[in-house]
């Protein structure tokens, strides 16, 4: 009993101190541009119309397909889900005991009946809708042997009440990149899109430790 009284406050304290999410930091090395892969252009003399140092051809496709190239991701995400469940069951038991007789005399005190009934009725409804619109410019960090581009990038907005950030990673086919170096987020495979913030506004939308304490799955009520 004493051990239970000691462990219960410790478990409940851990439930309330649980962090809702890891704090995201700026200048993450994972999202840094691949600057070490950019080679300086060789400066050579040329004519007035043609400059060899400017590595571009009239017939060359300017869409992103190399490491270090830049492309813009058009965010067009919309999800909607709903779920409904209903369960009910019941159980009823009846049992009666007759009055026994001993030597021709009825023992009324030993007679009676037993009955039991249990009912359960539960229902649940869940609905969720998310929408994300906007754009973010990312860099090509790797080109796979089959030509698929590994893209990664982030955007930070510093506001007067905190910071907001957006991060995008995933795989893009070079054929899905438009001529203006843009690609829809719906064309990104293994997409990881994060949009959140930190600061006063983010803290106002986050549940406090006491709320998380009462809403934790280990809470007995």
Swiss-Prot record:
Alphabetical GO biological process terms: bacterial-type flagellum-dependent cell motility
Gene Ontology CC terms: bacterial-type flagellum basal body, distal rod, L ring; cell outer membrane
Membrane topology designation: Lipid-anchor
Keywords for the protein's UniProt record, in alphabetical order: Bacterial flagellum, Cell outer membrane, Lipoprotein, Membrane, Palmitate, Signal
Residues making up the signal peptide according to the UniProt record: 1-16
UniProt xrefs under NCBIfam families: PRK00249.1-4, PRK12407.1
Similarity section: Belongs to the FlgH family.
Function: Assembles around the rod to form the L-ring and probably protects the motor/basal body from shearing forces during rotation.
Protein known as: Flagellar L-ring protein 2
Species whose genome carries this gene: Yersinia pseudotuberculosis serotype I (strain IP32953)
